[in-house]
Structure formats: structure tokens, C-alpha cells
Amino acid sequence: MELAEKDKGRDFTLRNARMDDIDQIIKINRLTLPENYPYYFFVEHLKEYGLAFFVAIVDNSVVGYIMPRIEWGFSNIKQLPSLVRKGHVVSIAVLEEYRRKGIATTLLEASMKSMKNDYNAEEIYLEVRVSNYPAIALYEKLNFKKVKVLKGYYADGEDAYLMARPL
């Protein structure tokens, strides 16, 4: 899938990630997030969930990505305990100079659509640092709700919000 997007005068292209994008994805991960994963972790997720793993391209370079996975587990949003197929946003990042241009929103929307249509997920969830106000605002704009606080979730001891929404 390849989509051309225009937002605030910036052109970017969204497409499914490929193996030859992994090095650029890892570079973005290391530059923008304190949570870093080994090479094989990205490769496994791309092989297993590639239809929902997207990159944003500007001038032939990857400037953002979303890496998901699909899981079976208890619903994060239903009142009564029930097992559901759900999408999990493992990692999403956009290079700082390309933020606030609609790239993260577009990445999330494309991945959510694929999780629902290609993987039959019923809901989606993610974890976000309680101090990451811009990300929380983005997720709330996309109708994610704070489900609970995960105390000491991150390696540095910071708490996370678990946020979720139906697909």
C-alpha cells in the first residue's frame, strides 16, 4: 500500500515497511525513543505483521514508522472479561523535524485500518509515558482512552498509561 499525503504544505508518502527500511527504522528508534529494540525484533514484527507495519517517506528517506503486533488477550475496553484479538502498537516514532505535520496520525490510522481489515483485530492498545503530553493528546484525538496506569513500566521507572480504543 502506498498513499501520498499532504498536510500543512509537507508532502510525505506512506507505505508498508520493507526489509530494506529496517536500518532507517532502527536509526529513528534510537534517535527519538529511550526504548530501543534489537535488529531481530524489528525483523520479526515486519515478517509477522507487515501489512500493518508502515513507514512515512520524505525525499526517499524514512522519517517515521509504526510497528504493531496482533495478540489474543483479555479486552482492555469491555466491561466483562472476554478474550479478543487486539492490535498492539509496540513502537511509533517520527523524526523531530517532521513532527506536527500529520505523519503520526496518518501512520496510526493506516495501521489501525490494517489491524482491523487484515488481522481481524477488535481493539487496539498502546503504552505511553505519562510525561509524553504530545503523544497522549494525539492518541486522545484518535479516540484512545486511558485505561489504567502501569506503575514503573519503563526501565527508568516512569509510569505509563495503557490507552485503548475499539477498531
Curated annotation (Swiss-Prot):
PROSITE patterns: GNAT. GO terms for molecular function: metal ion binding; protein N-terminal-methionine acetyltransferase activity; protein N-terminal-serine acetyltransferase activity; protein-N-terminal amino-acid acetyltransferase activity; protein-N-terminal-alanine acetyltransferase activity. Changing H88A: 2.5- and 1.5-fold decrease of the catalytic efficiency and affinity for Ser-N-terminal peptide compared to the wild-type, respectively. Loss of acetyltransferase activity for Met-N-terminal peptide. Its main location: cytoplasm. Acetyl-CoA binds at I92, A93, V94, R100, K101, G102, I103, A104, T105, N132, Y139, E140, K141. Thermostable. Keywords: Acyltransferase, Cytoplasm, Metal-binding, Transferase, Zinc. It is found in: Cytoplasm. The keyword tRNA processing does not apply. The record marks E35 as: Plays an important role in substrate specificity. The record marks S75, S82 as: Plays an important role in modulating multiple conformations of loop regions and contributes to protein thermostability. Gene3D superfamilies: 3.40.630.30. It catalyses: N-terminal L-alanyl-[protein] + acetyl-CoA = N-terminal N(alpha)-acetyl-L-alanyl-[protein] + CoA + H(+); N-terminal L-seryl-[protein] + acetyl-CoA = N-terminal N(alpha)-acetyl-L-seryl-[protein] + CoA + H(+); N-terminal L-methionyl-L-leucyl-[protein] + acetyl-CoA = N-terminal N(alpha)-acetyl-L-methionyl-L-leucyl-[protein] + CoA + H(+); N-terminal L-methionyl-L-glutamyl-[protein] + acetyl-CoA = N-terminal N(alpha)-acetyl-L-methionyl-L-glutamyl-[protein] + CoA + H(+). Changing S82A: Has a melting temperature about 3 degrees Celsius lower than that of the wild-type. Belongs to the acetyltransferase family. ARD1 subfamily. This is N-alpha-acetyltransferase. It comes from Saccharolobus solfataricus (strain ATCC 35092 / DSM 1617 / JCM 11322 / P2) (Sulfolobus solfataricus). The lineage of its organism: Archaea, Thermoproteota, Thermoprotei, Sulfolobales, Sulfolobaceae.
